[in-house]
Amino acid sequence: LPGGSITQTLADGTVVTVNLTDESANISPSMGSTPLHRNVWVNGKAAVTLDGAGAKGATITPGYILACQVDFGAKGDAGASSKMTIDDESGNLVSGPLAGKSNGAITLGPGQAKNVTVLDLEKKDAYGGESHTGGNKFTGKTGSVTWADSTLGVSGCAGYAQARSYVKVAVSTDNVSSNVTLWGQPFSIG
């Protein structure tokens, strides 16, 4: 897949550049072993560069939109699991397996789509409970997220199935809060 790049200047002059590189998708047989199941392994790297006096960091949220042409009326399943590496401006590298799954009675009918984030980062909330986020926050002027062999799956899809990657970057400065979204090229998952 070709990946992509977008540069956007915010209202306060902060320049946000988002790059999606090393993007690939490998369609693989589903464990369901029927024409109604789709499975694909995806890889990619999202890198963000901020330029401007007010730029102090951002949150990178990579994910995929999954869609099905015809619904068979069965329950659906969409999920992602991966290994990721986070690199921030201070040179810190964090690597390890991540797992995220969004299960349930979803139905992907004509014209419907499901959002699946690649990351599922867990931390304690302000009250000591469990909190999950699909975005990786970094401080400084640069940050990146890399994912490898993340599995995306759809069940109950009787027609053409398609996916499209995205990288959403949330930037907050002293004067502005904004989101910049880079969309990847749509691809078939069977």
Model regions: which residues?
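Short beta-strands within extracellular/lumenal beta-sheet-rich domains
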Residues: 24-28, 58, 145-151
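One face of beta-strands
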Residues: 46, 62-64, 80-82, 102-104, ...
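Extracytoplasmic low-complexity, Pro/Thr/Ser/Ala/Gly-rich segments
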Residues: 1-55
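Extracellularly exposed regions in secreted/surface proteins, prominently low-complexity, repeat-rich
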Residues: 122-190
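A structural detector for beta-sheet-dominated domains
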Residues: 11, 21, 45, 51, ...
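Short helix-loop boundary/capping segments
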Residues: 78-144
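Exposed low-complexity, polar/acidic, P/S/T/G-rich flexible segments that act as propeptides
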Residues: 49-102, 177-190
